[in-house]
From Swiss-Prot:
SUPFAM superfamilies: P-loop containing nucleoside triphosphate hydrolases (SSF52540)
Statement: the UniProt record of this protein carries the keyword Membrane: yes
Role this protein plays: Part of the ABC transporter complex YtrBCDEF that plays a role in acetoin utilization during stationary phase and sporulation.
Protein name, as recorded: ABC transporter ATP-binding protein YtrB
Subunit structure: The complex is composed of 2 ATP-binding proteins (YtrB and YtrE), 2 transmembrane proteins (YtrC and YtrD) and a solute-binding protein (YtrF).
Species per Swiss-Prot/TrEMBL record: Bacillus subtilis (strain 168)
């Protein structure tokens, strides 16, 4: 469906992306992860052609988007904030988007507006953060695109609204085979929704793989010791997930027998091997406490 080939982009002399390649298939939800400033938003803006790559190619169903702008009618981008929407009401936004997206489904949009009880007469800027997110998603899905680019869609909203937003995404993919490329600092959302993920680090896209396969690469070990082994563990560059008294929880690659042997040599009184979640893998890859 969408294919990025060796995409590179520098902004103000700083290399943001370098030789990034990725293919997202029809009906796939792909999670894009990375620290703040790693280039996630830049990548979405490049696909939507809001900004242009210095080199590389973006294809939709084999057609180069830059040379065939009408292809963008199949793609919609939902940024973290959308100041363009601010001065318009729902109906005004529908009128605008119908001109851009010929497949825009007004009936479906109205149905979702009623379901989520979003005020139709208020201007976008007058809505709460949660309602803004829901309205943006309603408009994005009603445009009937093949690919939706979502930048932090659940940022700043309460738990109930977040649940509704996530369910709307899942339903859309299940019912219409829509593809979604999503960035989010809420790793539990990514873990719940995505088929595959990739990490943006050092200007490149790494570890593009099935989410379950990625989690299978690591093992979480909970141990208890008679003595303080904190320094010894950290000197081996073993990610420490938690320490509570004599209990230590670490994360290591399953294939790293050397680190596992080192931990065994510390003679733990307790040794429990546990499944991992995506946030723990993220910490293991990027180190330290999460700062994104």
């Amino acid at each position: 469906m969408i294919e990025l080939r060796q995409l590179s982009k520098a902004i103000d002399g700083n290399q943001v992306l370098k030789d990034v390649s990725l293919t997202i298939e029809k009906g796939e939800i792909f999670g894009l992860l990375g620290r703040n400033g790693s280039g996630k938003t830049t990548m979405l803006r490049l696909i939507q052609q809001i900004i242009f790559a210095d080199s590389g190619t973006i294809l939709f169903d084999g057609v180069e988007i830059k040379k065939h702008p009408k292809v963008k009618q199949n793609i919609i981008y939902m940024p973290v904030q959308n100041p363009f929407y601010d001065k318009y009401t729902y109906k005004q936004l529908v009128d605008i988007l119908r001109r851009i997206y010929p497949k825009f489904d007004v009936t479906y949009a109205n149905e979702l507006m009623n379901r989520y009880e979003i005020p139709e007469t208020k201007k976008y800027r007058e809505l709460s953060t949660g309602l803004k997110k829901q309205l943006s998603l309603v408009l994005s899905f009603a445009a009937r695109p093949a690919l939706i680019l979502l930048d932090e869609p659940t940022d700043g909203i309460d738990a109930v609204t977040r649940h509704d937003v996530l369910q709307l995404m899942v339903d859309e993919v299940a019912e219409r085979d829509t593809s979604i490329l999503i960035t989010s600092h809420r790793l539990e959302d990514i873990e719940r929704m995505c088929n595959r993920i990739g990490f943006l680090e050092d200007n490149s896209l790494t570890n593009v793989m099935d989410l379950d396969e990625l989690k299978e690469e690591y093992i979480k070990i909970q141990m208890a010791f008679d003595t303080d082994v904190n320094l010894a563990i950290r000197e081996q560059n073993i990610p420490m997930l938690d320490q509570a008294g004599v209990f230590y929880t670490v994360l290591i690659p399953k294939s790293d027998e050397e680190k596992k042997s080192f931990l065994r040599e510390l003679k733990p009184k307790v040794w429990n091997e546990l499944p991992v979640n995506l946030e723990e893998v993220f910490i293991a890859k990027f180190g330290g406490k999460r700062r994104w």
